[in-house]
Amino acid sequence: MASKEELLQELSDAIVSCKKDRVIAAVEKAKEVMEPAEIIEKGLAAGMNQVGTLFERGKLFLPHVMMAADSMTAGVNILEAEMPAGTETKKLGVIVNGTVEGDVHDIGKSIVSTMLQSAGFEVHDIGRDVPIKNFVEKAKEVNADMIGLSALMTTTMQGQRDVIELLKEEGMRERVKVMVGGAPATQAWADKIGADCYAENASEAVAKAKELLLGK
């Protein structure tokens, strides 16, 4: 019988391999000795973390990321189907995530959404080229704890500031945290516009979200 560490390693490796059948086999084996939350967080999400890192380094490409995310969803679905009726996995918080108006880049933001979801957050990904007011309207609708704002061009970064200003106008700024990211964004920019945090990559986005919303 494989040890827990070996099972978790295989779950992670299976995600990185982007092979759905391998992920499903690893989940089937792991669920005999582990709780679903542990399988997701320490196995599947760890693998997705690795995928995010490899993508950022140019070692994996978008099709790999999408296949890995699809494989992870298949694994999570198996675990959710086995939970007793009425059992709900506790969500760590509600996050609205999107790419600001004028910016059609989607890849990094999609990876962040996948990673946040796999870490246990309820994520509402509202896509790319999103008008400023839509972020705030969606945050109201779903009672969001945080808004994630991605901008991949210097010309669209201003949209991140505009969302924060609109949150203030709507009297929501105290309650809703704001995370910014994207190639031109920096910690200095986040400080300048009054964002709560800046995340350089998907793994950091998860860590910062936990830190801000859970104090972890």
Swiss-Prot record:
Role description: Acts as a methyl group carrier between MtbB and MtbA.
Annotated family: Belongs to the methylamine corrinoid protein family.
Record NCBIfam families: dimeth_corrin_MtbC, pyl_corrinoid
Positions of methylcob(III)alamin binding: H105
Residues annotated as transmembrane: none
Protein name: Dimethylamine corrinoid protein 2
Pathway in which the depicted protein is active: One-carbon metabolism; methanogenesis from dimethylamine
UniProt cross-references to PROSITE patterns, sorted A to Z: B12_BINDING, B12_BINDING_NTER
Taxonomic superkingdom: Archaea
Alphabetical list of SMART domains matching this protein: B12-binding_2 (SM01018)
Gene name of the encoded protein: mtbC2
